[in-house]
Amino acid sequence: MNVKFKMPKLSNLLKKSWASELLMTFLGTTISIVLTFGTATWVEHRQQMKNRRQTAMMVISNINVFGENMRYIDSTLVKWSSTLRYIAELPRDSVLNLSTDDANAFLSAMFGAMLLQRDKTAENIFTSDISTWRDVGNLRFISGVGECYSFINDIEKNYRIQLERKGELRQRFFEDYYNEQMTGGECVAALLDMKGTKYFINDFTGSFVYYFEESINNLLQMNRINMQLIGVTPEEVMNFIKAGEQPLQ
């Protein structure tokens, strides 16, 4: 039996070979582009997520540090409040006969000032570059941070008012009695007799110290909600703060 083989034309072989190579080249290029683009997108997404978390941690830590600074100041305010109230309620004869230590404690409470300071870098970033915060992608978190900073500004304003009132009383007292030779008890009595002193003491001991303490609790509670919104624990915040306090090597 004769078997006939039909030889393909050379032109057909060339066409098939060219088409095959072209197809393989196209597929290879497509796969390469897809893999490269997909990897780049994934890396970018991971970096964005990392940046968002770092930015959020910076703000949360900043608010927390302010709250803890308030707590430190509050311990002194409570002592001052107790001293002022106790001595202001004493009979005048007892005031005139105060010991040097008690008189000094009263004058320190009246004229002492602890500055409530903070680093405003995080707040400035928050308020000046809102696009940065849109990238965080959590509107409730953004709103919560804004409320915290608004609350902090109110606290600073009210605290500054107390310092200014103290400063006014201090200036008037020294203008009136700078050249007077008085005992500690006489100084305290003169200060209590001065217009505005007892009103300040009543306001400071009766409402401001309470307001300050409640503000600490409220601010830190608001910030705990911020932590929950982005899945951050208090331990992570403390570690972030400690890392920021380390000196550069």
Model-found features: residue ranges?
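Alpha-helical transmembrane signal-anchor/signal-peptide segments
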Residues: 43-61
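Interfacial alpha-helical end/capping and short helix-turn segments at domain and membrane boundaries
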Residues: 2-14, 60-249
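Membrane-embedded hydrophobic alpha-helical segments
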Residues: 9-47
